[in-house]
Amino acid sequence: VDRQIGEIFQLGEELKLDEKTLVFFSGDNGGADYFVSDDHPRGIHQANKNPKTGVEYRGKKGVLYEGGLRIPFVVRWPGKIAPNRVSDHLGYFPDVLPTIAEATGAKLPSGIDGISILPELLGESSAGRKQSQHEFLYWEFTGWTAVRHGNWRAVKPAKATNWELYDLAKDPSESQDVASSNPRVLESLVAMATKAHEPVQEGTFTRTDRHERDRRAKMGKHDEPEPPKKQKKNVQTKS
């Protein structure tokens, strides 16, 4: 990956497009603790451990604790974004589209979830406005639900009956559930989750044969799955 990205950057310089190219580089989910053992309790890759602070984020890919959601996010735009700067702005993937739209002057469709982070990237003085903030961030995945507001995070694991609440400013590892001592905070975050939830609508799911093909490809099988069998119709004949 490093070599191929380097080749892209080098080509941009050769074509004199380097300072006209805004690049986003990110992971898609938290790490997975592959090959766990007594010697490597978090797996050989030490999934979701902050190398600078030593904080071990709870969870992994596929769950909605911090370890499943925190990802690297790097933005590059030579001549526009100052290098070697670290931001603590809270954002997520839907922010990429409006950021690109603002940078290019494109018109955005209505009703999108993201906000532009261009002021955070360029500096508010260069962008000509202050950076807006999300009221909250919301996730749903395989029965899990989570919502974050500031440093508060409420999580409801799959099949759980009760919500959990964590103060990430004091407990980034999410080791102490403080729901019982902060009922009003939890109530507020659950209300946000209820506001954000959209029930599944009939007829909007995708074709299952595509997912079956992807699943088989992960196992090294690149053949086409068998098409679904057609159901026989009952035909009534008159005697």
List where the protein language model places each region.
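C-terminal cap/loop subdomain of S1 sulfatases and analogous C-terminal strand-loop tails that border
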Residues: D33-L64, I81-R85, H89-L168, P199-V200, ...
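Beta-strand elements within well-structured catalytic alpha/beta cores of enzymes
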Residues: I5, G12, L22-G27, P72-F73, ...
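Short glycine- and hydrophobic/aromatic-rich loop-to-beta-strand nucleating segment
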Residues: F73-V75, G91
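Loop/turn elements at helix/coil->beta-strand transitions in domains of secreted/extracellular proteins
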Residues: L17-V23, R70-I71, Q133-H134, H149-W152, ...
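Extracytoplasmic/secreted proteins, especially bacterial periplasmic and envelope-associated proteins
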Residues: R3-E7, K16, K52, D95, ...
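Long, internal low-complexity/basic segments
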Residues: V96, G150, A154, A160-N162, ...
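Sec-exported extracytoplasmic/periplasmic mature domains
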Residues: G6, Q10-L17, A101-G105, L122, ...
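Metal-dependent active-site segment of extracytoplasmic phospho-/sulfohydrolases and closely related
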Residues: V1-D38
